[in-house]
Amino acid sequence: MPNAYKRVLLKLSGEALMGDDAFGINRATIERMVADIAEVVRLGTQLAVVIGGGNIFRGVAGGAAGMDRATADYMGMLATMMNALALQDAMRHAGIEARVQSALRMDQVVEPYIRPRAIRQLEEGKVVIFAAGTGNPFFTTDTAAALRGSEVGAEVVLKATKVDGVYSADPKKDPSATRYSSISFDEAIGRNLQVMDATAFALCRDQKLPIRVFSINKPGALKRIVQGEDEGTLVHV
């Protein structure tokens, strides 16, 4: 079966790396994620990753109360760097070649973000992990995913979450909530569905870059999406 996508951008939240822990990085969880990523890479799909940092520090969280927002956001960017290095290390152990490119320079540890280099590495079959968000405060890693996905020519942004798609309401609070198989950007905005933050959402819509929302906890979901199966919710123009 030919793959439905040649190049994808996977958005992983920092919280997804915690597993059942209260904070930090759960090694078993990250190894399971890497096993799913390895399957996709071996199918021949080029894969880039944007990683969040909420498992370590979040600029808008309670721990940042009273702190200058820009300072808190820069701390969050450093948290994404830790997650990116952990992800790269787990990939190396799984036999996957991965590169970390950061929007903030830390040359002894990771490469700086250079778009042509990132594209070349993807074409060579390497996984490229984008760290430090956009490199600017006041922008989320969701926005970084929309930006990097647009820059490297990804065909879709795959947003891995704790639920298996976009629902009409919070399924944890409303048992009657229904999951959308697909929904347009305009409809999602009109219904105030929290797929991504507004800036990220608007960028994807303007660039006609679809978003596929799926559960990171569902085994094989990433592979099924790449092979064209109807997994989670597709948000489209």
UniProtKB/Swiss-Prot annotation:
Signal peptide: none
Activity regulation remarks: Inhibited by UTP.
Catalytic reaction equation(s): UMP + ATP = UDP + ADP
Keyword Cytoplasm: yes
Binding site for UMP: 53, 73, 134-141
Glycoprotein is among the record's keywords: no
Main location: cytoplasm
EC number: 2.7.4.22
Alphabetized UniProt keyword annotations: ATP-binding, Cytoplasm, Kinase, Nucleotide-binding, Pyrimidine biosynthesis, Transferase
InterPro entries for the chain: AceGlu_kinase-like_sf, Asp/Glu/Uridylate_kinase, Uridylate_kinase, Uridylate_kinase_bac
Record pathway: Pyrimidine metabolism; CTP biosynthesis via de novo pathway; UDP from UMP (UMPK route): step 1/1
Pfam families, alphabetized: AA_kinase
GO molecular function: ATP binding; UMP kinase activity
This protein's GO CC annotations: cytosol
Domain of life: Bacteria
Record family assignment: Belongs to the UMP kinase family.
Subunit structure: Homohexamer.
Family matches, as NCBIfam families: pyrH_bact
Protein name: Uridylate kinase
Name of the coding gene: pyrH
